[in-house]
Amino acid sequence: MAEINKPAFKKPDLKKMTPKGERKANRRGAARLAAVQALYQMDIGGAGINETFAEFESFWIGNEVEGEQYLPAEAAFFRDIVAGVVREQKQIDPLIDDLLARGWPLARIDAILRAVMRAGAYELEHRKDIPARVVVSEYVDVAHAFVEKDETGMVNAVLDQIARRFREDEFTRS
C-alpha cells in the first residue's frame, strides 16, 4: 500500500519546470499540478480536504521535497480546483464516464488520470475566465508528467469533448 505522502505514480520532471521568470501562467500550471496530486492523494489515501490543503500548502507547494524543488503555486487557484472537484464530483464523474470507451468506466481508470480529468472537467465547466484550449493543453501537459503518451491521448479526447460541450462558442469562432 502506498504511503500517503509519497506518490505511487511517476514523478513529474520538475527540472523542466523552472521557477525562473515566474509568471501567473507558471504559478497556475504549478497549481494545476499540485491540485492533481492532491486529488490523487485524497482518492487513494482517503485524506480529507482540509488535511490535504494544509499538507500541500505547508509541505509541497514551493518547497524542496526529496531533492526536488516544487514551484510556487497560486494558492487560491489550487484551492478552487480541489474544492471545486470535491464539491462537483457527483456531476463531474458521470460526465467523464459517458465519454470514456465502453468497458472502461471511470472507476477502472488509473487514479492519477481520474484526478487529471476531474480537475480539467471542473475548470472547463466552472472557470470560463480561462480559454478552453489552454485548460485542455495544460491538463494534457500535467498528464504527460505521470503517464505514457497513449494515456495522454485519452485525457485530450475526453477534455476536448467536455470543452466543446461547455464552451461551444470558443470552437465556432473564426
From Swiss-Prot:
InterPro entries: NusB-like_sf (IPR035926), NusB_fam (IPR011605), NusB_RsmB_TIM44 (IPR006027). One of its GO terms (molecular function) is RNA binding. One of its GO terms (biological process) is DNA-templated transcription termination. Signal peptide: none annotated. Keywords: RNA-binding, Transcription, Transcription antitermination, Transcription regulation. GO terms for cellular component: cytosol. It holds the Pfam family NusB. It comes from the Bacteria. Belongs to the NusB family. Involved in transcription antitermination. Required for transcription of ribosomal RNA (rRNA) genes. Binds specifically to the boxA antiterminator sequence of the ribosomal RNA (rrn) operons. HAMAP family: NusB. This is Transcription antitermination protein NusB.
